[in-house]
Swiss-Prot record:
It catalyses: 2-C-methyl-D-erythritol 4-phosphate + CTP + H(+) = 4-CDP-2-C-methyl-D-erythritol + diphosphate. The gene is ispD. The lineage of its organism: Bacteria, Bacillati, Bacillota, Clostridia, Eubacteriales. PROSITE patterns: ISPD. The record marks R155, K211 as: Positions MEP for the nucleophilic attack. This is 2-C-methyl-D-erythritol 4-phosphate cytidylyltransferase. Belongs to the IspD/TarI cytidylyltransferase family. IspD subfamily. Catalyzes the formation of 4-diphosphocytidyl-2-C-methyl-D-erythritol from CTP and 2-C-methyl-D-erythritol 4-phosphate (MEP). One of its GO terms (molecular function) is 2-C-methyl-D-erythritol 4-phosphate cytidylyltransferase activity. It comes from the Bacteria. NCBIfam families: ispD, PRK00155.1-3. Keywords: Isoprene biosynthesis, Nucleotidyltransferase, Transferase. Its EC number is 2.7.7.60. GO terms for biological process: isopentenyl diphosphate biosynthetic process, methylerythritol 4-phosphate pathway.
Length: 229
């Protein structure tokens, strides 16, 4: 029977947080951010396994969090790579071979909802690839190299992409292998498919599905958690 697997990418160092502690290990309400992220997927009935990708020297720390909070479905903890795309590739190689849909998610994005996860799987089964996100609230400007505004895109045509980003496993693995062979750089996994002419369906995420990257995000995260509990 085919599986739905999730790769949690927790290999970032969080330089923008101005902290010696990696952002995924910082705490909200006395629990690490990683706990909230892992628990969202481990308790979701459509998720069969979790592969956690982290810094090599943090594998033991992650294992302790998993044990302390009795988090299920984590099949492997694997070391990350130099860049995020290398970490994702390591995760892709570690998932079960009977995986059909793989979700790739930021460890520092702890407020993903059950509906976002379920819709990602559903749309991937329908279209082969899907990513959640939101329409920007602010007006977006395009500027030239001198710093002057030259265009104002219609906000309805713009999309702030979040995670999870969800894919047919064989498609995303094949594209990552090509990316590695051609030595191309990307900033997220939808770009991996775009590089090879594949389309990604974009569906509604949530403005609360933030990635915690700055001290201000930690404060906002506490407020979001209070509303959710």
């Amino acid at each position: 029977m085919s599986k739905n697997s999730v790769i949690i990418v927790a290999a970032g160092k969080g330089k923008r947080m101005n902290s010696s502690i990696s952002k995924q290990f910082l705490q909200i309400k006395n629990k690490p951010i990683l706990y909230y992220t892992l628990s969202k997927f481990s308790t979701h009935e459509s998720i069969d396994e979790i592969v956690l990708v982290t810094l090599e020297d943090k594998i033991e720390v992650c294992g302790d969090i998993i044990d302390k909070y009795n988090i299920n479905k984590v099949s492997k903890i694997v070391p990350g790579g130099k860049e995020r795309q290398d970490s994702v590739y390591n995760g892709l190689k570690a998932v079960s071979k009977d995986c059909e849909v793989v979700l790739i998610h930021d460890a520092a994005r702890p407020f993903v909802t059950s509906d976002i996860i379920e819709n990602g799987i559903r749309y991937t089964n329908q279209y082969g690839a899907a990513a959640c996100g939101v329409i920007p609230k602010d007006t977006i400007k395009i500027k030239n190299e001198k710093g002057f505004a030259i265009d104002t895109p219609n906000r309805e045509d713009l999309f702030i992409v979040q995670t999870p980003q969800c894919f047919n496993y064989n498609i995303i693995l094949s594209c990552h292998e090509k990316l590695k062979k051609h030595n191309k750089k990307v900033t997220d996994d939808t770009m991996v498919l775009e590089n090879y002419g594949k389309s990604v369906y974009l569906y509604e995420g949530s403005y609360s599905n933030i990635k915690i990257t700055t001290p201000e995000d930690l404060i906002l995260g506490e407020q979001i958690l209070e509303k959710l509990t």
